[in-house]
Amino acid sequence: MGHKYDVYGMGNALVDMEFEVTPEQLASLGIDKGVMTLVEEARENELIAQLAQQRGKQSSGGSAANTLVSLAQLGGTGFYACKVGKDEAGAFYLQDLNDCGLDTNPHHETAGEGITGKCLVFVTPDADRTMNAFLGISGSLSVTEMDWSALKQSQYLYLEGYLVTSPSAKAACIEAKAIAEQSGVKTCLSLSDPNMAKFFQDGLKEMLGSGVDLLFANEAEALEMAGTSDLNQAIAYCKSIAKNFALTRGGAGSLIFDGENLLTIGTPKVQPIDTVGAGDMYAGGFLYGLTHGMDYEKAGQLASETAAKVVTCYGPRLDTEILQEILQSVQAV
């Protein structure tokens, strides 16, 4: 049967605010470098005030949203299940999804029920990405926001690992995965962040259940989940929980397991300035490839090229024209 959507994604809806800082500033502000940390609203407002002079651009973020936006820019179709508040940031966020060609669940939240989440993104000169997120109303994402008919009309269900921090969102992920499996929709999960694998491992294992069709992880996340410092053991662990996986390794490229063979995908040599969104972009390129007739190797090449490009500029997204050029160059080989 024909599918209405290539991917049905579930994730946090956060407006990103980017700041260029030094590692010393992060230390003086008491911010853990290189990971995502959840903070309360008061703490977030305090940081915004202290760093007002270094504030960069504001954009719609959320890991799975970034993935679906890149999928749509490449020419794919997506539905994004999320939750925003009835405020300026929420309106900005929904308009952005709409402008990108993505469908989303209706938002009928009344004023006063909660505010749209924000993520402070700190970029250091070494191109590392550090995040402090206040989830706001996104933290109460639940089965209420799900559109099961849209899910059943999709090729893939994409779950964002960050949702593990919210009991209601985690429960929605588990239910969505069960419905996907009953409906012949392939399931995939992104581990999202080393801190998720470290502090919410039991919850991630609940979300994984009996396993997924496709797992996205970076090396640090895979090692943390496997409880090892040995890459081969981490690979064996990934094989035990996913039929296929893509394991990203930064400048060393990525490893893709297609169900039979472990493929090594190189990555273009670039000078990274901001690694925010690299994993999201990789997943978007990979899922576009798989849903548009590419084999795992070709999809991996597209994913690597798009991720390598996004780290050379600030922010988690690329212009559509740039992504289309990359797609054409990969298809031409």
Curated annotation (Swiss-Prot):
One of its GO terms (molecular function) is kinase activity. Disulfide bonds: none annotated. It is an enzyme of class 2 (transferase). It holds the Pfam family PfkB. It comes from the Bacteria. The keyword Isomerase does not apply. Its EC number is 2.7.1.-. Keywords: Kinase, Transferase. Transmembrane segments: none annotated. InterPro entries: Carb_kinase_PfkB-like, Carboh/pur_kinase_PfkB_CS, PfkB_dom, Ribokinase-like. Belongs to the carbohydrate kinase PfkB family. This is Uncharacterized sugar kinase slr0537.
